[in-house]
Structure formats: structure tokens, C-alpha cells
Swiss-Prot record:
This is Cytochrome b. A ubiquinone binds at H201. GO terms for molecular function: metal ion binding; ubiquinol-cytochrome-c reductase activity. It comes from Sorex daphaenodon. The lineage of its organism: Eukaryota, Metazoa, Chordata, Craniata, Vertebrata. InterPro entries: Cyt_b/b6_C, Cyt_b/b6_C_sf, Cyt_b/b6_N, Cytb/b6-like_sf, Cytochrome_b, Cytochrome_b_C_euk/bac, Cytochrome_b_N_euk/bac, Di-haem_cyt_TM. The cytochrome bc1 complex contains 11 subunits: 3 respiratory subunits (MT-CYB, CYC1 and UQCRFS1), 2 core proteins (UQCRC1 and UQCRC2) and 6 low-molecular weight proteins (UQCRH/QCR6, UQCRB/QCR7, UQCRQ/QCR8, UQCR10/QCR9, UQCR11/QCR10 and a cleavage product of UQCRFS1). This cytochrome bc1 complex then forms a dimer. It is a multi-pass membrane protein. Heme b b562 binds at H83, H182.
Amino acid sequence: MTNLRKTHPLMKIVNSSFIDLPAPSNISSWWNFGSLLGVCLIIQILTGLFLAMHYTSDTMTAFSSVTHICRDVNYGWLIRYLHANGASMFFICLFLHVGRGLYYGSYMYLETWNIGVLLLFAVMATAFMGYVLPWGQMSFWGATVITNLLSAIPYIGSDLVEWIWGGFSVDKATLTRFFAFHFILPFIIAALAGVHLLFLHETGSNNPSGLSSDADKIPFHPYYTIKDILGVLLLILALTSLVLFSPDLLGDPDNYTPANPLNTPPHIKPEWYFLFAYAILRSIPNKLGGVLALVLSILILAVVPFLHTSKQRSMMFRPFSQCLFWILVADLLTLTWIGGQPVEHPFIIIGQLASILYFLLILVIMPITSLFENNLLKW
């Protein structure tokens, strides 16, 4: 009798994705982040569901409903901080996952990569709307500043902003719709992640060498199931440590003040994971130019496969490209730091130089260096 897992209509999908899936024998821990992102998404959906049971999306009661969750609901504080810090863990895993893709040339799988870029946008949109929900000072002013950016779009800008607001300012209508979208988007993200996996399994995983691994494959289970479980345990350890020891480490103290449209906080800034993009936005003195740079800072990932000039897929055997990759990482860390600083000298010029370097590295320097490396190998 054939094994049920190989014949049952539902089980065989699971079997071909997580059990009998042929996987390269040499994939490193950098390949763990896909499963970690799946775990993060499940944590966020579950904690979010329980938060939604007690949250009210009304300007008058939103802030106090979050206070009520933290004070009166059984383990409400735990659920709330798991959700808030879970978002941070989600973005750490996302950035490492994308970084892995850039380093090892995983972007050569075009469909998988493009859906990944779409997923990144969806997660960023979800996180932004979630940050508005507690209706603290930074929630309100963050929503005002970011939605206002759309007014830079020629001709339809101001109408578009008022349409998104549902009025003439960020108010009850805005909060209600943001809650609705924040609730539905994670399920759309889950569906997209399924498509992301579907396309990945069409080609099979890449590996650190960037060479075809068809000659040397091993089953996903038990080798990579065990490896993924180790990764998940480390993720949960990091998340629970953050939640139980310093839950407010990554948050903004201004968000413990209820939203007040009459009082602007001295420094409006988003959560840490948006700071690099915020720094790029602020480094351009023109509003429309800033908005375009902000969108392009993420959308540039979709162009990366077309800028691949090397004859090798991975950076494993390309020392000059490796150096540039780590300069890019350092540049992004610099942008993250600048995004959290006030708009004054010397931060303005540092931010502008870091923004120029970011685009130059990806669009010009790295492709030219790849060509130079080809010549070194006489290819």
C-alpha cells in the first residue's frame, strides 16, 4: 500500500512542500529565515486576533482600550508586547532574508523574488497601519505625516489624501479603516507567501555556492525540519527575552501620550524598521522627489536581477562584490541611525551622502565591479 501522505490530496501538498522536498545539501543557516518569517506571521496573526477581541477602533476609546488590554485583560500585557515586538522580529528576519537573497543571487528566480518584493511592501503597509491603532501621539502624527506625502502626487494628490483620511484630517474614519485593513492584510500576506513558496518549489532552493545542486539533494525532513526548529527556538528565545525584560526598548515614549492634534511632538519619527527609508525621504529637499526616492528605495529591489552582470550567481567567490555588499549594509545602518536624528547639521549632509551612496552602490558600482571580476577571471 502506498503511503497515505503521498496519495491523499491534501497531505501530498504538505508532503511535497515540507517532507519529501528535495533540498540542496549545503544550504546554511541563512536559509532559515523563510520558515522564521512564517512563524512570525503566525505569531502576529494569533496575538493580533486576541488583541482585536478587546480593542475598539474609535478615536475616543482606542488609547484607553489598549490601556485596558495591558491592565485588566488576563495576560493582555503579554499579548500586546508580543505583537508589538513580534513586528520588530518580523522585520529583522525580513531584512536578513532579503540580504541573503542579494548576497547569494537568489533574485535570479524572478517570480519568487518579485512576489517577495510585493510581500515586503505588504508587510510595511500592515506595520504602518498597525502603528496608528494605539492612537498615541506618534501614532497620530506618524499617520498624518506619512499619508500627507501622497499630496505630492501631481493633480490628484490632495483629493487622494482626503479620500484616504475619509475627511479633512486624520480622524475616526481614518482609524476605523486602518484597523479594517490592518486586520485583513496579514491574511493576504499569508496567501502571497503561499504563492512565493509555490514559485520557489518550481525551481528548488538556491545554495551558497550559486551552482546547480541537482546532483546532490537531500530530503527536507528530517534534516531541515530539525534545523528550522532550532531557528524557531532561537527566535522565540529572542522575542520572549525582549518582551519580558525590555518590552519598550524599540518603542517611542511619545506613544504613551494620547493623540493630540493641537500638540506636535518635537521629533516625529516612525518605528526603527522604517528609519532607513525615512532618512532617504528627508534627505531630498523636494516633497515629490522625496516621495519618489522613498518608494524607489524599496522598489529598486525589483531591478536588481536585471543589474546582475557577473558570470557567477553567488558572491561566495567574489571578494570585491562582498566588500561592496557589506558597505551597503553599513550604509543602511547609517541611514537607520540618521532617520532617528533631528534635521540639523551634520545629520542632514550625512543622510544625503548615505542616500546617494545607497542608490549608487546598487545601480552603478556593484554591476561595474561584477564586470571587473569577470575580467579578472578572464571570462
